[in-house]
Amino acid sequence: MGSTSDPSPSIITVAAEAPVTAERKQNLHLQEQLAKPYVARALAAVDPAHPNGTEGHEHHNMSVLQQRAAFFDRNNDGIVYPWETYQGFRAVGFGVLTSILGGFLINLGLSYRSQPSWIPSPVLSIHIKNIHRCKHGSDTESYDTEGRFEPSKFDAIFSKYALTQPDALTSEEISTMLQVNRNLLDFIGWVASIAEWRLLYQIGKDEDGLLHKETIRGAFDGSLFERLEKDRASRTKIV
């Protein structure tokens, strides 16, 4: 007869016949660190260090995914055009060529799914109210299919892949995560995830080549982009 102190098989997170479950760990104490981490948050990208989301960041009653997309809505009309995506890329520090490609490819890929009708947009507009339809596969699942933020999925990025530092990812760790997250035959999702994470790494890594948890969290709700734009504007004024 087993000891009463032995954990129930129903909550054990490692299976001996599946070594990968030991390699990619879960945070067994997340519920002690953050209230109801299993509940997807509609308005705030939360973690144990930010239980109320990003301080000073306005949600405007948008989902977390909508908040991210709204940064690129430069005239706040609820629609993102390719030239606005370009402007958003430039605002956070990307070069002209990357911004042109981003403006075209992102809007090309997301426009139709976000349209309010079956008629395509000739100018590749993206409607923010329908941005949840544009969620691709092979991702971290930190957004759910309605655009809410999943705290437990976000935390798993670091419990599973942050082996060098607990709250940051190296370039190699990002590559591992991207490979692991690939869904079978989901070529579009593979490419989209690689592009998103490599672009984020380019603008968000520190001098040691680490992409920190706070930087990544800010990318999910768009607050990182707002901060980068303000920092660039401040430097321009000084010059």
Curated annotation (Swiss-Prot):
SS bond partners: none
Domain EF-hand, which positions? 60-95
Tissues in which the protein is found: Expressed in pollen (at protein level). Not expressed in leaf, root, stem, tepal, ovary, style, filament or stigma (at protein level).
- A cellular component annotation (GO) from this entry: endoplasmic reticulum
Q: Which residues carry this modification: N-acetylglycine?
A: G2
Q: What is its main location?
A: other
Cofactor notes: Binds 1 heme b (iron(II)-protoporphyrin IX) group.
Q: Does the keyword Transcription apply?
A: no
| Reactions catalysed | RH + ROOH = ROH + ROH
Which positions does UniProt annotate for Ca(2+) binding? D73, N75, D77, E84
Q: Name one GO biological process term.
A: negative regulation of lipid storage
PANTHER family the UniProt entry points to: OS03G0222600 PROTEIN, PEROXYGENASE 3-RELATED
Q: What is known of its domains?
A: Transmembrane regions are predicted by sequence analysis tools, but these regions probably constitute hydrophobic domains associated to phospholipids. The proline-knot motif may be involved in targeting to lipid bodies.
What is stated as this protein's family in its record? Belongs to the caleosin family.
Protein name in the entry = Peroxygenase
**Organism the protein comes from:** Lilium longiflorum
From the broadest rank down, the organism's phylogenetic lineage runs: Eukaryota, Viridiplantae, Streptophyta, Embryophyta, Tracheophyta
